Amino acid sequence: MSNRRREFIEYIDSREPVEADIDISDKADRLTDIYDSDTYGLNAMRETLPSHCYKKIREVMQTGSALDPEIADMVANGMKEWAIKQGATHYCHWFLPLNGLAAEKHDSFISIFPGDDKVLLEFSGMQLIKGEPDASSFPSGGIRSTWEARGYTVWDATSPAFIRREKNGAILCIPTAFCSWTGEALDQKTPLLRSMEYVSNESIITLSSLFNEKHKRISPTLGIEQEFFLIDRKFYLARPDLVNCGRTLIGAKPPKGQEMEDHYFGTMNSRIISCIQEVEWKMWRLGMPLKTRHNEVAPGQYEVAPIFERANIAADHNMMLMDILKNVSTKHGLVCLFHEKPFAGVNGSGKHNNWSLSTDGGSNLLEPGHTPSQNARFILFLTAIIRAVDIHADLLRASVAVPGNEHRLGANEAPPAIISIYLGKELDTVINNIINNTDIQAPGSDDMDLGVVGFPPLPKDSTDRNRTSPFAFTGNKFEFRAVGSSQVVNFPCIVLNTIVAESLRFIREEILREMKVSSRQTAFNKIIKDTLIQHVRVVFNGDGYSGDWKELAKSRGLANLPSTPEALTNINSEKNIKLFSESNILSPVELESRQEILFEIYNKSIKIEANSLYDLVSTLVLPACFAHQKNIAESVNSIMPFIQSQKSFSQPNHQYSHLSEVVESVNLLIEANQKLLALIKQTKDFNSEHSLATFLNQSVIPQMNEVRKFSDHLEGIVEDKSWPVPKYSEILFLR
């Protein structure tokens, strides 16, 4: 082991958990008192706004109705006074451009009038509602040129403003949308809000026309399970690949990985739990209802998850959570990795999106009745979702097509790249009975008898959990498991909202058309049955990891798009352009720009990885191998006189064999690395992002895998003290 790595290990061994600035014995820091205290939500508004203003802004937040400009100044003043009491000196419009990160520009509250040296603290309604950042400096997919810089941020009143606390002050952050001067959406939030409105309207009309239910708003809800790795910061900084790419580009399989199955739900390391506890307190102050935390399957991997929230708020909270996890982990001497596959040979990370639809009265539209077979409303929404996923599986796959997910989807740790739906035995029986015109037998609710005296019988859930399915029904929601851990959740949710809304409209119109010639019940049964017959092919309740499923999916006509370039190609198909433009979610220009940006992100990510790998091998791995090679050669040469003097020495000279293996492996690594460099140089010859992505996927990535193969082999035979970077056995297990 190198002296440097030994120093890291000794340092890590001496580290103690870092205490957060929270004293839970103090009443002011109790959860019930501090929850939501750093957001300008309804509680803070009630205390700072006039009654009529509060009622109006509450209506805006709860129903999504338009904000009256006349009350904007009152809201801005109340927000400013509240923020100043929280220690804020600056405010910012906090928005989500198309680069996958949050963006903000800080402005202080201070104002000075001409001829008056007195400083005033001001914040107007116009400053609250509208900002003007440079739109040309963010990814736009061609919508904005460098000389077309004007863009606008617009307050999203449905998502509360919040305080971000730093060591030397606080900032008032105002969630906003971001658009160009010509009106195109340049962010992740705007189309999400549009899609929420679309699915709300289509659900309201469907419930009114077919079930005589009256609602003002239906909200898509999300519960987001965030997975991540926490590793020691010293190991991270000693790995250029982790610093540059967020994942390791080399690294031999350690003697122990996750095969003992001892990490999942295991007792948390004290440094780790101290870090996560501080994150929880910060998120609770921001009004995020974090509920669970636990060790995940891979060593060093963890998960936190909140209670369901309205989709746009859940999306904002997830971005805030990722940001706070990064910052707090640094304080604790750790680094939080969100890459989908930071380490080869152990499970990668995802971000399961639990999606449902909730009425303004609090009812879950995906909650079956006493039994699913008795609930026509549930069956209609279920049928609409089945149809939506079948027709638009390509879009769902594209919505999770990020570079890191290529390493995860399709492996025996995550859902396959084939999009299918898992319903469970009970619902599958109901669906087949509808299709086959057989009587629907209500299964009733069974109990599980654990066979232990003193243990009560436990009610069985109506569905099992199928972790191999990318889109699974789990009792009262659908769990979209293919979303990558590093992703902004907005685009997958936009797609889901949009395709379900379109499907609801189609089925409703078909039923209403059929009702002109038959009874309501007959029309309902016919259209539901016909729709299920046409789209039930997407339902699969078996093992998604099996090779048989790939063959079966192919026979059913389901697409298998394992690579990111393949998945992104279909985004701007005629079908998808029509879907988004007719629903006013994304114009053809906005959709094409997103496809272009996703290709750009993929290409830049792979090129960074390829260059990082070449440099890592050239400047760290090969010098270590040369030194080891020299040591072996000198050692073997030093014993040559002895070997030559032993005429009866009959044993094969394994030392020569070992030297030959090292020399050959080093030669192969040099050759592979030079081939990689040649391919990197070829990337400059491409004018199309699409064709470049295909080249990177089919040529550069396979060559990177070749380089890694030889490097990892050498890691296993080069003297440990000579190896230049921390190994998996150290990074994954030492905290």
Swiss-Prot record:
Q: What is this protein called?
A: Type-3 glutamine synthetase
What GO CC annotations are associated with the protein? phagocytic vesicle
Under PROSITE patterns, the record lists:
GLNA_ATP, GS_BETA_GRASP, GS_CATALYTIC
Q: Where are the transmembrane segments?
A: none
* Ranges where the GS beta-grasp domain occurs: 89-183
Q: Name one GO biological process term.
A: response to bacterium
- UniProt similarity note: Belongs to the glutamine synthetase family. Type 3 subfamily.
| Reactions accelerated catalytically | L-glutamate + NH4(+) + ATP = L-glutamine + ADP + phosphate + H(+)
Subunit-level organization: Homohexamer.
Keywords for this protein: ATP-binding, Ligase, Nucleotide-binding
Q: What domain of life?
A: Eukaryota
Q: What class of enzyme is it?
A: ligase
Under Gene Ontology molecular function, one entry of this record is: glutamine synthetase activity
Q: Which InterPro entries match?
A: Gln-synt_C, Gln_synt_N, Gln_synth/guanido_kin_cat_dom, Gln_synth_cat_dom, Gln_synth_gly_rich_site, GS_Type-3, GSIII_N
Under the heading PANTHER family, the entry gives:
GLUTAMINE SYNTHETASE (PTHR42974), TYPE-3 GLUTAMINE SYNTHETASE (PTHR42974:SF1)
